[in-house]
Amino acid sequence: MLYSIDNIAPDCNQANFIAPNATVIGNVQLEQDVSIWFNVVIRGDNDPIKIGAGSNVQDGSILHTDIGAPLTIGKMVTVGHKVMLHGCSISDHCLIGINST
């Protein structure tokens, strides 16, 4: 599901796959060939979230921001199952392991 918040809608036009029960909210930009898997929540309500080309966010992960703390994921990144990312930057070609916080 895609939701706008404060009249800002997610930019997911280039994404390769968004699971039907994933939730993408607000100021979120998904670059080319990004995949968002089942039960993922990406909440760009306070600051922007950008996910780089070829990256994937796996089942049950939660990505969100805080005021002054945007979230940026580089290119070709794998965010493993049930990962919690809050207002951080991940470089290109990284693997964030299962259950990481």
Provide a role label for each language-model segment.
Residues 10, 47-49, 69-71:
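A structural detector for short beta-strand units
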Residues 1-16:
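Extreme N-terminal tail/first-helix region
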Residues 14, 19-20, 25-26, 31-32, ...:
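Left-handed beta-helix
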Residues 101:
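Conserved protein-kinase catalytic-loop segment immediately C-terminal to the catalytic Asp
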